[in-house]
Regions:
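Alpha-helical transmembrane bundles and membrane-interface segments of multipass inner-membrane proteins
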Residues: 1-210
Length: 210
C-alpha cells in the first residue's frame, strides 16, 4: 500500500480530486442559479452565487488580461516547484500543502481562461447555459471566477454607544469564496503553521537541484 501511494501519486490524487470537485460545484452553480441568488443552509452558511472578475478599482481590459496571465505564470511556477519537491522526496505533508495551493490556483485559472467562452452571462433574470448558440459572455482569458460559499457567522449591528461604528451593520465573516480558494487557504495556513522552517530549505534545494 505504501509503495502504491508514493508522494507523486498522492500529489496527483489531490490535484485531480480538488480540481474535479471545484469545477463540478462551479458548473452546477453557474447553470442552476441566477446571479446573486442565495440558498440558505443555516443562519451562518449560505450558497450565494457571485462572480469575481479579479479587476481592482474598476480597471478594465488590460488589468484583467494582465491578472490572468500573471495567474498562469504563478501556477506554472508553483507546479514546477511541486514537481521538484516530489523529486527531492520532501515530507508528505509538505507535498500535500503545496498540492492544495497549486490546485486551488489552477481551478481559478480555468474560470478565467475558459468560462467566458463556455457560458453566457449570468444575470438576475437569466441562468447561464453551457456552450450557448450565441457564444459566451467574454473572449479567452477574460472569464470571471465563480464564487459561492458565504459564512456570515456574526451578523449584527454595533451598539449605538460605540464611537465611530455605533449603529453600523457588522458581518463576520463577509468574503464569498469557492472551493479552490479554500484549498489555497488551507494549504498556505498549514505551510505556515507546520512547515515554515522547511519551506525555505525546500525552495533553495529545488533551485540548487534544477
Amino acid at each position: 500500500m505504501s509503495k502504491f501511494f508514493t508522494k507523486g501519486r498522492i500529489a496527483l490524487l489531490i490535484i485531480f480530486s480538488v480540481l474535479i470537485i471545484d469545477q463540478i460545484i462551479k458548473i452546477w452553480i453557474k447553470t442552476h442559479m441566477y446571479w446573486h441568488e442565495s440558498i440558505r443552509i443555516t443562519d451562518w452558511f449560505y450558497i450565494y452565487f457571485t462572480e469575481n472578475s479579479g479587476m481592482a478599482f474598476g480597471m478594465e481590459i488590460f488589468a484583467k488580461l494582465f491578472l490572468t496571465l500573471f495567474r498562469i505564470a504563478a501556477v506554472t511556477a508553483i507546479g514546477w516547484f511541486l514537481h521538484r519537491f516530489v523529486k527531492l522526496g520532501l515530507k508528505t505533508g509538505f507535498i500535500i500543502c503545496v498540492s492544495l495551493v497549486f490546485t486551488g490556483a489552477l481551478g481559478n485559472i480555468i474560470d478565467s481562461v475558459f468560462y467566458g467562452i463556455l457560458f453566457n452571462e449570468s444575470t438576475h433574470s437569466q441562468i447561464a447555459s453551457f456552450m450557448p448558440e450565441g457564444g459566451g459572455y467574454a473572449p479567452w482569458l477574460y472569464g470571471k471566477v465563480v464564487d459561492m460559499f458565504y459564512f456570515p457567522i456574526i451578523d449584527t449591528n454595533w451598539p449605538e454607544w460605540m464611537p465611530f461604528v455605533g449603529g453600523e451593520h457588522f458581518i463576520f465573516f463577509s468574503p464569498i469564496f469557492n472551493f479552490a480558494d479554500a484549498a489555497i487557504s488551507c494549504g498556505i495556513i498549514a505551510l505556515l503553521l507546520f512547515y515554515g522552517k522547511d519551506f525555505n530549505d525546500a525552495y533553495h534545494a529545488a533551485i540548487k537541484k534544477s
